[in-house]
């Protein structure tokens, strides 16, 4: 890349005080919301995409005449007046300091020094980043509330406009005439029921003593109760007459409530909640949206909250001496046990606040609570998923900022710490692996402190997490010399599908050639010849003694992979990135055709075909993760998810969610495909135990109480 040594416009640059280059939450285009090729204007707070995306940064220059912009990921500086990249700095050295600060923010390492010898800690007081600041969290809290309010207002206005138009249309007039007579009948029935209720109450009141004396008697007794109750613990019981009146009025109210056809409805469709991009976190947002829309996975974590038993055991152990209390040492050991394979130990904080950027306030209306860190010293991804899903499926928020989820990921999966762009497939594998380890550790550590019901629930959820994506492959190697077949069973949690050979070389005409996911599955299960005589066949070497001096017989062989056990949720990872050169990975940008329904029967072994019914091979598309961009280390992730509550597809682009059709989904450039088995091997459509299905459809009503306890 050629660049200018000197640019007079950079030399004249005065860095704006409100520039957005150091704010990871603003590293997305304000117009199209992409996180690929993001340029921050250094003369104002504007952030937009480059000319190879939608040219929104160029349009900003044409409108504002601000010439200098910084690419926040690669840290290039570009001058639009010179139309070239520049290398020089201004007299105060702002660009050099910006680059060093950006590197510190991305890596979350603030221990490098400036020219004056001071530590570079401008973005945080501790080891965590800008998003942990109270001011930033309060600002995003207000923005989340405002976004939801505006979304609700637009929805109401659009509904009024549509109803006005529909009532004036011929179809609308016909619809209004049909139920007119039915409405009259319903009104008459309601009026009759109300009159009967009034007569009943009136008859009960007439059979009691006069209302005046009753009122005076009740007033006198209530006054005595109010005065005496301050000094005497026991309250004077009210008169039977008054109790009867109160019970009658309560019955009347409950009857009216039950008769009322008006029910509380969620503000938004449950699940249609955007996740704010906290700084190149589109990979995390797309994966979380997909997992929350998988019915089985969501119901498990709506039901399970690991922090509940931690709090309960901690309080119970202070009362009894049967077991030692859950101390900091115990919690630290559990965290250390979780991280022993990765060598990363979570640091303990002395004061921690609440769990997610979402929650409930008093009453029905929920308020987002922006925490610094999770609520417990035991950092739990399961707890953060539980809390996040509670808010996303409460039907109350159009946008939520998953601060605590990102914080927990940073602590427990250190490879994803910082604001660098990451791969969604790698994050999904690491997240599921960490969740599985956490459930196993929690279920086996300190079993005496965990209630039996909670241990049973943890075991059930662990069983679902282990089996929802788990399948088995039959690896069959055939010796070409004696035709002996050697079978090996291998587990899998996803199928990584390679593109056919014609897409493995660079060329301009490759992108125009069609490719189908069924073709990639056929390539995955096709017979592959092993190169040369490299196979040690047991049959050919059976006559050779174990300690014989004769050489081992090597033969030619062929290998084939077939599916012998189908998972309930099938993950297909399309290997779009290939190595080009020594250190470069380029993307295969060809469109892969896929259907809403997938039949896996052609890719299974014979034994599986005989043991399963035909409908067990049918899968329905549930979600699609897309990668926008050209390179492995850059780009933007979005997801298409099927919302079972609303019965429609939704495109999840960080904070922006929009309904879409199946045709739009099938046109997407898929990176990860999620298919759900229509009927399981047991003949059921769900893998969940009845205990998990009970009362966990969606937390519209429960979120007001349970979320308030968790998040406040």
Curated annotation (Swiss-Prot):
One of its GO terms (cellular component) is cytoplasm. Its EC number is 3.4.19.12. This is Ubiquitin carboxyl-terminal hydrolase 44. One of its GO terms (biological process) is regulation of mitotic cell cycle spindle assembly checkpoint. Residues 690-712 are annotated as: Disordered. The gene is USP44. Residues 273-678 form the USP domain. PANTHER family: UBIQUITIN CARBOXYL-TERMINAL HYDROLASE, UBIQUITIN CARBOXYL-TERMINAL HYDROLASE 44. The lineage of its organism: Eukaryota, Metazoa, Chordata, Craniata, Vertebrata. SMART domains: ZnF_UBP. A zinc finger (UBP-type) spans 5-102. The modification Phosphoserine is found at residues 169, 239, 401. Zn(2+) 3 binds at residues 41, 44, 60, 66. Zn(2+) 1 binds at residues 7, 9, 79, 82. Expressed in testis. Expressed at high levels in T-cell acute lymphoblastic leukemia. Dephosphorylated by CTDP1. Ubiquitinated; undergoes both 'Lys-48'- and 'Lys-63'-linked polyubiquitination and is degraded by the proteasome. Deubiquitinase that plays a key regulatory role in the spindle assembly checkpoint or mitotic checkpoint by preventing premature anaphase onset. Acts by specifically mediating deubiquitination of CDC20, a negative regulator of the anaphase promoting complex/cyclosome (APC/C). Deubiquitination of CDC20 leads to stabilize the MAD2L1-CDC20-APC/C ternary complex (also named mitotic checkpoint complex), thereby preventing premature activation of the APC/C. Promotes association of MAD2L1 with CDC20 and reinforces the spindle assembly checkpoint. It comes from the Eukaryota. Zn(2+) 2 binds at residues 29, 32, 49, 56. Keywords: Cell cycle, Cell division, Cytoplasm, Hydrolase, Immunity, Innate immunity, Metal-binding, Mitosis, Nucleus, Phosphoprotein, Protease, Thiol protease, Ubl conjugation, Ubl conjugation pathway, Zinc, Zinc-finger. It is found in: Nucleus; Cytoplasm. It comes from Homo sapiens (Human). GO terms for molecular function: cysteine-type deubiquitinase activity; deubiquitinase activity; zinc ion binding. InterPro entries: Papain-like_cys_pep_sf (IPR038765), Peptidase_C19_UCH (IPR001394), Ub_carboxyl-term_hydrolase (IPR050185), USP_CS (IPR018200), USP_dom (IPR028889), Znf_RING/FYVE/PHD (IPR013083), Znf_UBP (IPR001607). Induction: Transcriptionally regulated by POU5F1/OCT4 in embryonic stem cells and embryonal carcinoma cells. Induced by TGF-beta during regulatory T-cells differentiation. The keyword Ubl conjugation applies.
